Amino acid sequence: MNELSIAYGLLKDLQHESEKHGVSRVSRVHVRIGRLCTIVPEVLTFAFETASEGTVAEGAELSIAVVPARGRCDKCNIDFDVETDTSVFFCPQCGGVAAEVISGRELEIALFRGTSETTS
């Protein structure tokens, strides 16, 4: 299950960022995942819930935005949506092979919210 290792990676990043910003409890995490990453959002959500037990993010709400796959043609210089069921992306205008994938490979924590403990 690739999603479980991704969940552990996200939790490692959350732990680091929480310590850096004085956050003791993460309540919400928003993740951006590119369509080309072949991650199943529901499986990642389950993996995150399981892996987060006993961590700063235990019980946190995970929301996932899937970023569309887009390519850029170096001949026409246009951006276009690409099909994710193929490994070669063709320009819809000239038929050329897309020289660059400009979105769809993202895997990032876009934001997280949490609270910090205060001592009296």
Place the predicted regions along the sequence by residue.
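Short, flexible, mixed-charge glycine/proline-rich loop motifs
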Residues: 61-68, 80-85
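Short cysteine-rich clusters marking metal-coordination/redox-active sites
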Residues: 73-76, 91-94
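Short loop/turn motifs enriched for small/polar and acidic residues
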Residues: 32-36, 65-69, 110-112
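Short Cys/His-rich "knuckle" micro-motifs
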Residues: 83-86, 101-105
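Long, charged N-terminal interaction/targeting segments
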Residues: 1-63
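Long, charge-rich boundary regions
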Residues: 2-4, 105-120
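Cys/His-rich microdomains that often coordinate metals
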Residues: 79-80, 98
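Cys/His-enriched microdomains
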Residues: 71, 89, 107
